[in-house]
Amino acid sequence: MEIETDQSIEAMDTQDTQEVEILTSDLQQTQQQRNSPPQLPKFKNLIQPQLHAVGAVTQLPSENGNMPPQQLLADSSSTSFGDGEAMGIDDESKEDQFRSETTFSFTVENVVQLKSQRLSPPVYVRMLPWRIMVIPNDRALGFFLQCNGENDSPTWSCNAIAELRLKCHKPDAQPFTRARIKHLFYSKENDYGYSNFITWQELKDSEKSYVHNNSITLEVHVVADAPHGVLWDSKKHTGYVGLKNQGATCYMNSLLQTLYFTNSLRLSVYRIPTEADDSSKSVGLSLQRVFHELQFGDRPVGTKKLTKSFGWETLDSFMQHDVQEFLRVLLDKLESKMKGTILEGTIPGLFEGKMSSYIKCKNVDYNSTRYETFYDIQLNIKDKKNIYESFQDYVAPETLEGDNKYDAGVHGLQEASKGVIFTSFPPVLHLHLMRFQYDPVTDSSIKYNDRFEFYEHINLDRYLAESENTLADYVLHAVLVHSGDNHGGHYVVFINPKADGRWFKFDDDVVSSCRKQEAIEQNYGGMDDEISFHAKCSNAYMLVYIRQSELDRVLGDITESEISSDLVERLDLEKRIEMARRKERGEANTYVSVHVILEENFEEQHKRRLFDLEKVHPRVFRIKQNQTVDELVDLFVRGFGVSRQRMRMWNLCTAQTQKFSHFDFVAEGSRTIEQISTSQKPWVIWLQLAWTDVPGPLPPFNPKTESLLFLKYYDPRNKRLNYIGCTQQPHTRRLIDLVPDVNSKLGFEPDTELTIYDEYADKKLVNLNEPIESALFIPQDHLQGHILIFERENVDAKLDLPTVGDYFLDLVYRIEIIFSDKCNPNEPDFTLELSNRYNYDQLANAVAERLNTDPQKLQFFMCINNYKETAGNAVPYTFKGTIKDLVSYTKQSSTKRIFYQRLSLSIHELDNKKQFKCVWVSSDLKDEKELVLYPNKNDTVKGLLEEAAKKISFAENSRRKLRLLKISNHKIVAVCKDDIPLDTLLKSNESITTAQGAQKTFRIEEVPAEDMQLAENEFLIPVAHFSKELYNSFGIPFLTKARQGEPYGALKQRIQRRLNVQDKEWENYKFCVISMGHNADVNDNTPVDLEVYRSWTSGQLPFFGLDHINKSRKRSSLNFSEKAIKIYN
């Protein structure tokens, strides 16, 4: 298996290194049984065996004993090898060295006198050499199968099953055989078999006729899986490529292959608009990249960029996630990316089916029906023989009777039938087999490996309420398989890409063809027989079926012409850049990178110095170290289109001071780059080019008598420091003599007074009438590149930064800040360079100018630097501090980030409002979303709910009544009355903390119609979920109506209906009443005592507890880091 790492190191899958199973007591590894085993003999040292090539070997082995693959020919001729022969019998093409199975034999002569190990010539299966190995001992004959015996590499492995046979020379007699062997062959265990295959006494028994003319014939039938860690070309052998494993992402790889071969989905993914997306954060673009490489690439495809686009950290990628949850999250993300485009509706159009849940009373005319959609179906497999029994169990009606009667409102408790029926099935049907279920005995989730049959073709018409326009005939498209237990394991997928019966196995980076039996029957589970690669713990956990009538649409071929040319060009460019980087890394020792800076780079710099090495975009030339300076200059001539006479080279001596030394490429022309290049990597030079409006060559430069000066001008009105050119001046000239030339460059009057500064001296020059050499303190080593800054005298003092000194001081305080939209994470971030002395108004004006909006309709939030940077407290518009105060808590090297939010009202209007964050929960308790409301500061809960009603979409028949709840640690701690002032509510929320430090939130929800009116004997009681211990609470708590004295059985029935929990799952729930920290178990006949809930005065609000397993939590052995799967971008 190819492990995807930064170094692309190949290593074996951990699943592949599991212990092998000993099939019988005398079936052992030869390495453990031999006493001082000899080195594997080479063929030239053997007593030459005789070889009859019956579809096997026609030439002598090579010097090292290996038979080259090209020498495996279908030939009926024979070649003599001495006292033995090997025969290959292959039902498939005899020239196919990539075949998955074959039968071959080896005749051993002089067997009675056999004293040493014998090896047969190799026969190739899956591109690996397989040999029969014979090892005699005192009591019996040892018979082994060897794989790839000459290869000492630790990375290869191959899984195989084989039958070892001793042929009988009697007509129509059956060969002698032992139990089939099943083994993972790798470098340390490259042979497997029986050390005591048959005793000498039994072998020599003349009645059994095993020995004929002092010879025996041994035969092997071997079936091998595709090998890992060898040069296995999946594309060549199958036409498909695999996916690299990041360490524990085989669960994701199998699912991605399944989605890739859902061709209509793949085509829609190609068409997602991603032109403006950030390549590192776009899930759509990353999936496009993976699909495109799978379709057109020749090598296994990496997924690191995809998981990075998910926003996953390293730990997330190396954890085994729940596959069903990951599939749902990924499809939801794709569906959201397609909204608002022509692709909207693609996901439900492929995967969405519909069902109705019903309750029908037997004795009164009262029915309840609810219609739902689904993207997948969970089938119970426990105690079920096959897929039809599971579907029948899914739709089987349940009778509600006795203590479990249905509460039919005004009709009271009634006997009823309850069940579901499908109304339509989707084109692509995802079936999740419930291999992992809660076990009440162990009180944990376990994996069921029971045998469960599924079929290549199924019909589901009998499970529909009414027949659809086309038959519900389905063809099996993919079988996703898990090997292991509930703590982890390995995932592979078998796919029938064209639904034509040709199956392929996708095992991370290795793809191989396989038999239909291996893809289907051998994944039923409950087997550990001799004909299957799979152990008992290896079985199907998910099936993908495609509707027969939709095959052409779902599996239609996709050509490159159907993919956007812009996308193809972008992906090709990425690939070329990556290849160039790899090539550059590989040639780093033989090449030198020359970074060429031009004057245009100086013009981009408006700060100190001439350029910023971290931000400048130099022209890069790569040249071999043994090439000459003349050849480098020739590159410049061709690259810039200028003659040698119109260019001059300057070495950057130090990046810090940015001083240059003149490089005479004429004098140095014959020297090699290796001889003249500095220790600076890369080699940075400034290439001075003659100005296009100045004809002729550059004037000669004498570093002993001349100085190179760079000139800048400070523009106080635009607060910019502009580069205006360079000049070479004799040391004897005065600085004041430069003023007329500078005025001319700037278009000023010749007598305009200018002040001159030396940038490095960081002060105004006062000795302007002295020669340049003494005025600038030209050093003896003649480093060049003094920067002179000119500014006009008598500038308006009212300007923000009237002098260059003011400007430089401002630069000291400037920082780069990233601005992120708090409410819209998909909105691209932007960066502004601002002074950390800016006040709130200056900050708002700068951001508003960038966003082209009103600064009064922006609100800012400080950034919290936790696991992921998130928005913290809002910054009041009356804030008297500076930007420095907003970002000063971050580390010096950390990113400075501020969140912003666009407002629908002015920030001043907001001053009279109070921001109130809460959560809105839908009536089915499935959807949550954050609400940010702005009620008046002195408002009550009633005003808050009125404000919330403006932002909530109600159903047509809704009574539009809302209520506010306080939630802590997944429990309801208070039902807030309408007359409570919001100030009181918020202050009490801040002052109360729990022992666990649980965060309290407010929740707004619609009041159900049945809760509107409460009789004297009725009360709304809180309900909460927990697992085993009260502190392990989870999920969404809620209120439900209870009646004084009614049995808890009736209350539980109403809760089950509201939560839509299946009966079989509901049986695993436990129930108790929690009051004052104590819990009391209740049964169906226990009467409800409302005083327990009404008499609360302080502390935790009493609640009715549902104790059950937390299914939302992913299965992981690393409990400390368990969290739901999320795709952040």
UniProtKB/Swiss-Prot annotation:
It is found in: Nucleus. One of its GO terms (biological process) is regulation of protein stability. The keyword Ribonucleoprotein does not apply. The keyword Iron does not apply. Its EC number is 3.4.19.12. The active site is at C250 (nucleophile), H490 (proton acceptor). SUPFAM superfamilies: Cysteine proteinases, TRAF domain-like. Its main location: nucleus. GO terms for molecular function: cysteine-type deubiquitinase activity. Residues 1-20 are annotated as: Disordered. Keywords: Hydrolase, Nucleus, Phosphoprotein, Protease, Thiol protease, Ubl conjugation pathway. Residues 101-222 form the MATH domain. One of its GO terms (cellular component) is polytene chromosome. It catalyses: Thiol-dependent hydrolysis of ester, thioester, amide, peptide and isopeptide bonds formed by the C-terminal Gly of ubiquitin (a 76-residue protein attached to proteins as an intracellular targeting signal). Gene3D superfamilies: Apoptosis, Tumor Necrosis Factor Receptor Associated Protein 2, Chain A, Cysteine proteinases, Phosphatidylinositol 3-kinase Catalytic Subunit, Chain A, domain 1. Residues 241-548 form the USP domain. InterPro entries: MATH/TRAF_dom, Papain-like_cys_pep_sf, Peptidase_C19, Peptidase_C19_UCH, TRAF-like, USP7_ICP0-binding_dom, USP_C, USP_CS. The modification Phosphoserine is found at S1117. CDD domains: MATH_HAUSP, peptidase_C19C. Belongs to the peptidase C19 family. Hydrolase that deubiquitinates target proteins. This is Ubiquitin carboxyl-terminal hydrolase 7. It comes from Drosophila melanogaster (Fruit fly). The gene is Usp7.
